[in-house]
């Protein structure tokens, strides 16, 4: 788990539940939240002009996704979709960015997590 439940709740996290194939956020939407999987799996997808869907990445329990978009406020270039019955922590983006910028340990965790993700590509 990237950040403990205690830390997430101290930042105002909500726990949301999603059904299979339910959209969490869509391509073009601005980032407003930090997302961390509590239970289940989520996929990041890109819809193609020919009607097909490309899976870009899959995230499992304890992992966060699309967090880097909070730091530059660029729109998401993909969709996030629940793959199975799914619970997620959702933290308001401004609170999470403030926490990350002001807590050296949190930035180190994010850097290490992202470096680990990139090592699989």
For each predicted feature, which ranges?
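Short, surface-exposed, charge-dense and proline/glycine-enriched linear segments
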Residues: 9, 81-88, 112
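Hydrophobic recognition helices of helix-based DNA-binding modules
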Residues: 1, 44, 118-121
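Cyclic nucleotide-binding regulatory domains
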Residues: 22-85
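A small-molecule sensor/coupling module
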Residues: 95-121
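Cyclic nucleotide-binding regulatory module and flanking cytosolic helices
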Residues: 1-22, 64-65, 69-74, 102
């Amino acid at each position: 788990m990237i950040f403990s439940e205690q830390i997430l709740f101290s930042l105002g996290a909500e726990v949301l539940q999603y059904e299979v194939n339910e959209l969490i956020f869509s391509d073009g939407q601005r980032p407003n939240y930090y997302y961390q999987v509590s239970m289940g799996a989520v996929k990041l997808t890109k819809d193609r002009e020919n009607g097909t869907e490309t899976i870009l990445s899959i995230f499992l329990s304890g992992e966060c996704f699309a967090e880097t978009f909070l730091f530059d406020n660029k729109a998401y270039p993909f969709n996030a979709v629940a793959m199975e019955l799914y619970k997620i922590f959702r933290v308001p983006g401004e609170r999470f960015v403030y926490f990350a910028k002001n807590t050296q340990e949190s930035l180190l965790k994010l850097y290490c997590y992202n470096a680990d993700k990139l090592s699989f590509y």
